[in-house]
Amino acid sequence: MYSSSREEAVAAFDNLDTALNRVLKVSPDDLTIPECLAMLQRCEKIRRRLPAAEHPFINKLADQTDQTELGGKLPFALAERLHISRGEASRRIHEAADLGPRRTLTGQPLPPLLTATAAAQRAGHLGPAHVQVIRCFLHQLPHHVDLPTREKAEAELATLGGRFRPDQLHKLATKLADCLNPDGNYNDTDRARRRSIILGNQGPDGMSAISGYLTPEARATVDAVLAKLAAPGMANPADDTPCLAGTPSQAAIEADTRSAGQRHHDGLLAALRALLCSGELGQHNGLPAAIIVSTSLTELQSRAGHALTGGGTLLPMSDVIRLASHANHYLRIFDHGRELALYHTKRLASPGQRIVLYAKDRGCSFPNCDVPGYLTEVHHVTDFAQCQETDINELTQGCGPHHQLATTGGWITRKRKDGTTEWLPPAHLDHGQPRTNSYFHPEKLLHDSDEDDP
């Protein structure tokens, strides 16, 4: 089924490039309308088949490589090499695991987990949206549905997918799920598999969408908290002194014009703020669990622009000023990008140094990594064994996987003259990729810089 020769594999893709180049030169001028539709149908069939060609390569990388060889976890490595999003890379990895070829521990070939869906994809009958519907259907089936029934249902949906649009297939899958589980029986394993809370990206107005599924216990907990803090008159930001405990006054209740959704938002914010202020969360990466905000004195004085939190959230200056009114402040002093008077002779970074790194790096400094500061570790650019001091100018932030690459993965870190950290890959991973991370510093992309000057 698959070419085992390196030369055959390269030749096959060369032939594919050649054939596609010929297709790109085809003009529709001499074709009738039915013929144009037929050509588009053939294009769609080819597009649907291409993922089946990717699955064996992805599965090999997943099974036979490690982070050191890839330069990071597989989703990150694919996203960087293919210039796709991390989410898309993860989707392809999971799809390949379900639809791609497998092998036993002794190397014997096995059919794909979703045999019928894989065959329909290889034939060009199913597109990515069809496959997503089928995979979600199987993922959401309750635990008590046996394997033969699952396989029969999967085969039925794979056949229907070749005749219906994805939105129509979704409706058919919903009806089939009701037939297989008419009583709606789900156990703790089924519910635990679906639990999730997803925070969307910030929009132009700074707002973030939230979605997901709460377990019954989580729902009961949220209900109890909101019953108190989301009641009319409670935690109302429009009040001069919002009521956060006890019973709000009748005047506060009558003056509350918020919708139920707005009260839920404000009640949840009040609960989370109280948890942070309680100190019960302890420390996170060497600092008390808290909102860490970095901004400039100019922006504070002008009351314009945005500040950045350690989690990568942009805060309007009005929010920053309100938070700062009851916070401890830390002055960051620097000279042309280099920090002053922040070093000591201990190996571990001090709390002050960690705070400065939040403002300086804003997140993992590995090229194109988007892990925010809250989720990073402190890395010595020059190994502590060599310098015997922890100087802020020789520290940088790195997420766990990338910090490990610098420790045991053969990557070299160094500081440029402007204080930016460079990550130099080992030879087998060097394909001309960036050496520095501009993700958290988009302003650097707006002016020329000397990338090669260490």
Swiss-Prot record:
Q: Which CDD domains did the record assign?
A: HNHc
Disordered: annotated span: 422-454
Report the domain of life of the source organism. Answer: Bacteria
Kindly give the Pfam families that the UniProt entry links to this protein.
DUF222
Record family assignment: Belongs to the Rv1128c/1148c/1588c/1702c/1945/3466 family.
Instruction: State what protein this is by name.
Output: Uncharacterized protein Rv1792c/MT1741/Mb1728c
